[in-house]
Amino acid sequence: PPTPTVEELQTLLEQVETRRFASSPAVLQVRFTEMRQLQPGFHDAFLDLTLISAQSPVQAKRVEVNRNSFAALLKALYRQLSRQEALAVHDPASPARQLHALLIAPVQEILQEQGIETLLIAADQGLQAVPFAALSDGTDYFGNRYAFALTPSLALTPLAPAESRSQNQLAMGASTFDGLAPLPLVPQELERIESSSAADLYLNQAFTPTVLLERAADQRYSRVHVATHADFRPGGPAESVLHTGTGPMSMAQFADLRRQRRDQPLDLVVLSACRTLLGDADSELGFAGLALQAGARSAIGTLWYVDDVVTSAFFVQFYRLLDQGLSKAQ
């Protein structure tokens, strides 16, 4: 699908706000642009930030960066988060502060002036796996200030407000595997989701590749929740797999849902397996990105390994609030 124009984006943002699907929304595009003339040891790229809101003129900012230094900051922040270390945001040299200075600070004053509260961040390769919520200016975290969602491409994301639809849900997952660590709390997670949101449950042997694809293609369902292991391998979706209760399935199979759900895309696909948001260099958003390629309006994945107990409690609360009218970004 083609990328929407600025005028189309502004019209869509106005519709979203008018129909109260999001509060004061805007699109923030972030991408790298290579410098034509390089100096060894210095900046080798521009970080281009473009802010598009419904009523205001388009705003653009450009920051000089070194790609290797940026990647090192991102890796350091991942390490702190995965080890549950303090982010030390009081220190301007901390990764969370430095990344905020590059990605958010150039447009922060504009966001405040325009009263923006909700952002759709369209992130270029190398930026899709940034944990934006953890970035800080030293006084507060980005995730506390803004409701936001992330997309690898505006062309992949259905932006027009969705019509009211059934909230029928699939809850699928596996707790035991051949050659992989068990996920003992997956049954509890799915059962709690089933009881709180009247989902149809498929666990272990009942969770097969065929069942996943056939049920997800059924337009009676608008949400799919999958709790299992996923493996991202070099070579893209065809080589990467999702582990069902009867064995692995190629992630490339999932992309066919775009064709099958063309008239009524899935509203939400959740993948609460280990690190389902991250892929390889060719597909940073991993299975969550693939869910968007499959035509889902939204997808949720995890940036790092998560505790089963916390995951279960989070998603029960998440679906409860979603059913009460809270937006996914909030």
Please state what every model-predicted region is.
Residues 1-145, 157, 166:
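Domain-scale, conserved, charged regions that form catalytic cores
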Residues 152-155, 160, 222-317, 322:
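Catalytic cores of nucleophile-dependent amide-cleaving enzymes
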Residues 2-13, 93-94, 179-262:
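Functional beta-strand-loop-alpha-helix junction segments that form "active/interaction loops"
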